[in-house]
């Protein structure tokens, strides 16, 4: 009788495991949320998503647009503080995502050297949970839509790389983790790749 009882319990547990996929040991990929601020071009969003998914072998999700936070606005220069946007993104990030990338068409800035408010294309802390990119400065000097998208994909991949722990690359001049030094033309010279050295550095943080 006891043996029959034990057998029935085991059967119930096995059925329960099957129904709830408890035996599914498929590794979960790193999850990244892409958060548009305000109206943002859909074609650029799709390309950004495809770019970061491909380079980092992750799964990203485009969220519904939200307004830029008022507390990040810097009235004297009519732009938004990137560090404030990053903190805001970190606060609102859902636990289901490992990182969150904010994208905007508005100008963004940060404090750099002797400049209190320095206009930038993107910002990401190393390591970090959130980063932000803007097409406002990226679009300057572009010859067509394809050129703009290529530049912005590199910017977002670069800032996300900082979140994953990467420093500016000094090993390969074609690696997109090279420092742009504030120049969009530097971004154009880089390939949309991570060099082998950078790849090895983040292998342990990506699933």
Residue ranges of each PLM-predicted region?
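Active-site-flanking alpha-helical
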Residues: 161, 165-166
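Sec-dependent signal peptide recognition
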Residues: 2-8
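Fold-level signature of zinc-dependent metallopeptidase catalytic domains
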Residues: 25-43
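Metalloprotease/metallohydrolase-associated module, dominated by Zn2+-dependent proteases
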Residues: 38, 117-151, 167-207
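C-terminal motif of bacterial Sec signal peptides marking the signal peptidase cleavage site
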Residues: 13-16
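Metzincin-family zinc-dependent endopeptidase catalytic domain
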Residues: 45-155, 167
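Conserved phosphoacceptor histidine of two-component systems
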Residues: 158
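Bacterial lipoprotein signal-peptidase II cleavage site
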Residues: 18-23
């Amino acid at each position: 009788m006891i043996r029959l009882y034990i057998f029935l319990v085991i059967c119930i547990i096995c059925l329960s495991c099957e129904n709830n996929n408890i035996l599914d040991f498929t590794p979960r990929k790193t999850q990244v949320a892409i958060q548009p601020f305000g109206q943002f071009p859909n074609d650029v969003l799709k390309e950004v998503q495809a770019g970061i998914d491909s380079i980092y072998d992750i799964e990203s999700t485009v969220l519904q647009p939200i307004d830029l936070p008022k507390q990040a606005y810097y009235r004297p220069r009519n732009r938004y503080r990137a560090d404030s946007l990053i903190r805001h993104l970190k606060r609102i990030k859902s636990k289901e995502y490992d990182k969150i990338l904010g994208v905007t068409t508005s100008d963004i800035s940060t404090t750099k050297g002797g400049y209190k408010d320095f206009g930038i294309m993107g910002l990401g802390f190393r390591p970090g949970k959130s980063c932000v990119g803007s097409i406002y400065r990226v679009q300057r000097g572009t010859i067509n839509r394809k050129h703009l998208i290529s530049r912005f994909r590199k910017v977002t991949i670069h800032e996300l790389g900082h979140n994953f722990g990467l420093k500016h690359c000094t090993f390969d001049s074609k690696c997109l983790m090279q420092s742009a030094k504030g120049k969009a033309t530097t971004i154009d010279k880089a390939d949309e790749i991570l060099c082998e050295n950078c790849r090895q550095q983040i292998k342990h943080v990506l699933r």
